Amino acid sequence: AADAPPGADASSQMDPEAGTARRVAIPRVDAPAGLYVTEMVTSRALVEGNERTLDMVRPDPAERVRSLQLYGVDPAVMARAATMLVERDLTDHVDLNFGCPVPKVTKKGGGAALPWKRDLFVDLLDSVVRACRKAGERAGREIPVTVKIRIGIDSSHETATDAALSAQ
């Protein structure tokens, strides 16, 4: 792809100057899939108007379905970020990241650690689903919400079954 940084591939970490991860990955992935999800985007950075984050969520005009992976630990901030994404017509689908195993994320109680905090997990899900439903109704479209989960934080903290049941 002409706008891909030298040496980039579908799994590389994005250079903020190169645009969204999808612009690099889509031309390099030989697959018929029509849905490509962004790399994890922090809800707080979206709500605070961080320019790098806003650049990451701007969809490419060639995308048929715009899907965004959202991360956060505060239900109100997550709901505001989801509402903003729908109102600005930046996504057609929101995927909540409850699967990131990186210690930097799990130490803050996010990613794969969130399903362990069942009440917070359910509050986050409910707040984002409600926000997407309300903003989607105002925009005249339906915004599906999905979740990314892992088996658990580690082998002694398996949460996948409870998380999946809660997310239904």
Language-model region placement:
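Glycine-rich, positively charged N-terminal anion/phosphate-binding segment
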Residues: 1-88
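Glycine-rich, aromatic-flanked loop segments that form ligand/cofactor-binding clefts
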Residues: 33-49, 93-94, 114-117, 121, ...
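Conserved radical SAM core fold
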Residues: 41-47, 75, 98-112
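Short glycine-enriched, charge-decorated loop/helix-capping segments at active-site entrances
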Residues: 53-55, 109-115
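Glycine- and other small-residue-rich loops at beta-strand/loop junctions that grip anionic moieties
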Residues: 70, 113, 117, 148
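Alpha/beta enzyme core
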Residues: 79-108, 118-168
